[in-house]
């Protein structure tokens, strides 16, 4: 199974991350409020102190956060996920609902750093996230879609 970093374990992210654990993936989670990672750690996830630490060695990095500013905080900067040494050609998957301008900037920045980018906002509610029943609105390069 894949090694996955999951950034943002709030209302939606916790359920999504839980489904990945149940599917057998090796999951490392990060949340700015560490307490929110505890239930996932009890299910077998590893909790990380920074997005960079979570993303280290990952095949894919998934984010599910509240807004553009939270997204920028987990992806960019010295401890952001894009500063991590991940698996070669790692996927970045942004599931948050974000502005068009920021999504374009993030995709370009990820590409410049050697990551493949998938834009994947979701629709649904937390109870549906917990059982893997969300609608995904996926945008990606064709080859990246096939790989994902």
Regions found by a protein language model. Give the residues of each.
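Active-site-adjacent beta-strand anchor residues
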Residues: 30, 64, 96, 138-139
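NAD(P)+-binding Rossmann beta1-loop-alpha1 motif at the extreme N-terminus of oxidoreductases
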Residues: 1-63, 90, 126
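Structural detector of well-ordered beta-strand residues that form the stable sheet scaffold
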Residues: 28, 48, 92-93, 118, ...
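Rossmann-fold dinucleotide-binding core
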Residues: 4, 98-148
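Rossmann-fold NAD(P) dinucleotide-binding segment
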Residues: 51-116
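Acidic, glycine-centered active-site loop in nucleotide-sugar glycosyltransferases
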Residues: 42-44, 77-78, 89, 130-134
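Residues in the short beta-alpha loop(s) of Rossmann-like NAD(P)-binding domains
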Residues: 33, 67, 141
């Amino acid at each position: 199974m894949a090694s996955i970093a999951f950034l943002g374990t709030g209302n939606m992210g916790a359920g999504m991350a839980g489904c990945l654990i149940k599917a057998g993936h090796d999951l490392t989670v990060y949340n700015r409020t560490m307490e929110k990672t505890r239930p996932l750690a009890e299910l077998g996830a590893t909790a990380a102190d920074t997005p960079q630490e979570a993303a280290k060695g990952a095949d894919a990095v998934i984010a599910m956060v509240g807004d553009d500013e939270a997204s920028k905080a987990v992806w960019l900067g010295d401890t952001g996920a894009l500063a991590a040494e991940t698996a070669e050609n790692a996927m970045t998957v942004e599931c948050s609902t974000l502005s068009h301008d920021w999504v374009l900037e993030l995709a370009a920045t990820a590409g410049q750093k050697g990551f493949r980018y998938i834009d994947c906002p979701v629709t649904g509610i937390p109870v549906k996230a917990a059982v893997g029943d969300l609608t995904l609105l996926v945008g990606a390069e064709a080859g990246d879609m096939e790989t994902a």
